[in-house]
């Protein structure tokens, strides 16, 4: 009787089972004898190896991306899928050192060196954060291909992300405005007759995200609340569209309507009627020619108004930060603010509290009188 090799066992009911591993994945074959079981295992090993090689050569990265995306549909948000498509296309269209574009390469042709060259190529036109997002998506796709045994290894494993030496947005143009800056900015906007003035007033009085405001329809506004259902996003080809849902599940929310916010809505709707007619199915806040709000055009307008007002420039997100800052300073509860802002995690809101309190800590510390009437120094 042949000796039973390691990995094989005799089954209680008769016959043999042979367990073996190929590249981290376990397989089993069964036979009536040791010899039959051994032969089946060898044949199965060859089939597995051949299958891996054939699959890796047959599928291009573009083809596998469609398969990967299809498998994720329904388990992740539509807005996430749209963003991943857009980011993937940026990376997939790169041609490094005369080689075919990344998306046209078969899975087994993609090497670590090729991905490094793609990183380098992207630096000519994109920010560090965008490049890192591109490489994160490529890494996730290749990791999925590895799990399906379509490639023998993930060439992006260990690939270092680029270091972003820029200051965090909150330390530059992503900030809250002081009361003096707010007053100067809106005075300049009124004097120059900015088309976007109602939008700025609305953002400041609701804490909405720019994309959420740009996707609001007349039916989303009532006398006592504002319903956030969707946001502006980009399609696969980079075209600006209104998404079918909000940024996240927590982003879909009802905001109590302040009088100033409702006044801004009425002002914008009056302008829309004069310029475009009465269109109930179109967004409230639009571009001067009636299209969807473009971030670049709004940024340009804000920059011009900041220059006219003599204040440091900021982004449209600063209106949201300003609303949140004033809310914290007014004593609004963290949970309430989380719901109004649509933060997915209370930790995000608490970080905002910490940031606001850092700026007011010295003023409040100076106001504390530990020993009434005591000298400044008791040592």
Positions of predicted regions on the chain:
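Basic, Lys/Arg- and aromatic-enriched nucleic-acid-binding interface segment
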Residues: 128, 132, 136, 147, ...
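N-terminal DNA-binding module of tyrosine recombinases/phage integrases
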Residues: 9-17, 21-113, 270-280, 358
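N-terminal core-binding DNA-recognition domain of tyrosine site-specific recombinases/integrases
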Residues: 26-34, 70-155, 171, 291-297, ...
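Conserved tyrosine-mediated DNA breakage-rejoining catalytic core shared by Y-recombinases
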Residues: 158-164, 215-270
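Short, basic (Lys/Arg/His-rich) helix/loop patches that form interaction surfaces
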Residues: 97, 187-197, 206, 255, ...
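C-terminal secondary-structure termini that scaffold catalytic or DNA-interacting sites
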Residues: 1, 234-236, 241-252, 259-261, ...
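Catalytic-site neighborhood detector that most strongly recognizes the C-terminal catalytic loop/helix
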Residues: 231-234, 341-366
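C-terminal catalytic core of Y-nucleophile DNA break-rejoin enzymes
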Residues: 34, 171, 225, 243-267, ...
């Amino acid at each position: 009787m042949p000796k039973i090799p390691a990995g094989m066992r005799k089954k209680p009911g008769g016959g043999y089972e042979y367990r073996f591993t190929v590249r981290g994945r376990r397989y089993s074959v069964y036979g009536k004898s040791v010899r039959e079981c051994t032969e089946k295992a060898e044949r199965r090993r060859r089939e597995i190896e051949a299958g891996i090689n054939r699959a890796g050569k047959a599928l291009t990265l573009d083809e596998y991306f469609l398969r990967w995306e299809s498998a994720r549909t329904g388990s992740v948000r539509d807005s996430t899928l749209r963003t991943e498509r857009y980011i993937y296309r940026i990376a997939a269209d790169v041609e490094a050192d005369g080689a075919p574009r990344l998306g046209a390469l078969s899975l087994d042709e993609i090497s670590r060196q090729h991905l490094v060259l793609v990183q380098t190529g992207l630096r000519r036109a994109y920010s560090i954060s965008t490049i890192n997002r591109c490489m994160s998506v490529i890494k996730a796709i290749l990791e999925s291909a590895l799990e399906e045994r379509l490639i023998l290894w993930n060439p992006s494993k260990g690939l270092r992300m680029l270091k972003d030496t820029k200051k965090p947005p909150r330390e530059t143009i992503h900030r809250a405005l002081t009361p003096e800056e707010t007053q100067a900015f809106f005075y300049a906007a009124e004097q120059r007759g900015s088309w976007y003035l109602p939008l700025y007033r609305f953002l400041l009085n609701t804490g909405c995200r720019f994309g959420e405001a740009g996707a609001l329809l007349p039916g989303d506004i009532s006398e006592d609340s504002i319903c956030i259902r969707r946001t502006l996003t980009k399609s696969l080809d980079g075209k600006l569209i209104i998404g079918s849902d909000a940024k996240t599940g927590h982003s879909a929310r009802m905001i109590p309507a302040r009088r100033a916010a409702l006044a801004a809505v009425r002002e914008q709707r009056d302008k829309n009627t004069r310029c475009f007619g009465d269109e109930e199915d179109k967004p409230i806040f639009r571009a001067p020619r009636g299209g969807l709000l473009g971030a670049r055009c709004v940024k340009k307008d804000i920059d011009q108004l900041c220059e006219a007002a003599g204040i440091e420039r900021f982004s449209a997100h600063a209106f949201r930060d300003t609303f949140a800052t004033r809310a914290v300073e007014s004593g609004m509860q963290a949970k309430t603010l989380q719901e109004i802002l649509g933060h997915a995690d209370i930790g995000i809101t608490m970080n905002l509290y910490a940031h606001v309190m850092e700026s007011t800590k010295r003023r409040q510390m100076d106001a504390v009188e530990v020993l009434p009437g005591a000298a400044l120094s008791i040592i």
